[in-house]
């Protein structure tokens, strides 16, 4: 994406009403920020700061109320359009981060800007304006929210790369190749009488194969980026007292769940997000599965089945001594069957044989069974690394987060759609005499799918959904 210049008429910001919001998180903090963006913001600056400020310089001064008394003292920053986050005139007021002070400062800005139509910003509206004014493309705008919400260091670094435009540049490179191939097809359609065969001369089939191969690489990397963003939802299930809470504590490296030898100690689900190699894992410890007359425990068991229905992977825990001596019990076989009924299609189950430290000669290990098994001891940690490795394998993590960009399911869907259209295009290329128009159309649809990632082609409905999930001050 080419940065706009002052002389470029196309870089002029879209005319909108001015907006304001507290840009920092709710609560108390050392610093709080009120952001104002839009036309005629100088009027707010003059009223609140008492004077006009030099562009892009930090100025320490009092923030004034309508009577000229100081609300707070802090730093004011003035960014004239188009050289600002939104591409509009932007005023940022950095004061002390108390909620009362911030609300007073925001209210003062709104009153000072009443005559110019200043209003409170909607969620994500600052970033939406940055997108509409070509300061960010859509993938970069989404990366702003992903960076804020990142739950691991790897996710944060990948989001930062997306914000820098790494993902967008990769998609743009694919689009350029598709456009070039489309030009060859259109030339062949428009000039059929020419002696030169544009497609044969340019090796159109070879170009298409190259585009598909590059797209496969982007899709594989995007899947890894999506895993960094979304993580894995892991549910611990099994009969009471098989060590589910102990396993949660072992994976988390902290005493998060109460552990006692009394069956039914856990009556409601306990959730904790941990990370393995930068992948966030949302681990859910659940109530033991059994028939019970206890109303509270029964509700907990119902929530267990609800959690299983939303899982990305289910760990069915069994007692190693019982399993080694007698195999799968009727109760555990019934649990296996019910898990299969509740999990979404394609969601794997991993059998975790726990308490090997109490099972004689049992040793930690992985068994290639159906479902796969991991033998471990949550109490002394034996085999925990094997379980971590199994979870990464199930997730499809290939390691090496360096260079990855964060991706969303929306991006994966667009990439898969583009690949499908390119596959159909390849079929038409093999039957070019009858299908040249269809070849061109599939290339157009592939380009459209890729453009939807960066927002070069996006519906208003899609934009509304994306930006509504931002925090107010972004």
UniProtKB/Swiss-Prot annotation:
GO BP terms, alphabetized: tRNA methylation; tRNA wobble uridine modification
Q: How are cofactors bound according to the entry's free-text note?
A: Binds 1 potassium ion per subunit.
Provide the binding site for K(+).
241, 260, 262, 265
Chain residues that bind GTP: 241-246, 260-266, 285-288, 377-379
EC number(s) given by UniProt: 3.6.-.-
Q: Where does Mg(2+) bind?
A: 245, 266
Keywords linked to the UniProt accession? Cytoplasm, GTP-binding, Hydrolase, Magnesium, Metal-binding, Nucleotide-binding, Potassium, tRNA processing
Name the principal localization, coarsely classed: cytoplasm
Cite the binding residues for (6S)-5-formyl-5,6,7,8-tetrahydrofolate.
Answer: 35, 92, 135, 474
- Tell me the compartments it is located in: Cytoplasm
Among the entry's GO cellular component annotations, what is one?
A: cytosol
Q: Which GO terms label this protein's molecular function in UniProt?
A: GTP binding; GTPase activity; metal ion binding
Q: Can you tell me which family this protein belongs to?
A: Belongs to the TRAFAC class TrmE-Era-EngA-EngB-Septin-like GTPase superfamily. TrmE GTPase family.
Describe the protein's quaternary organization and the partners it interacts with. Homodimer. Heterotetramer of two MnmE and two MnmG subunits.
Q: What is this protein called?
A: tRNA modification GTPase MnmE
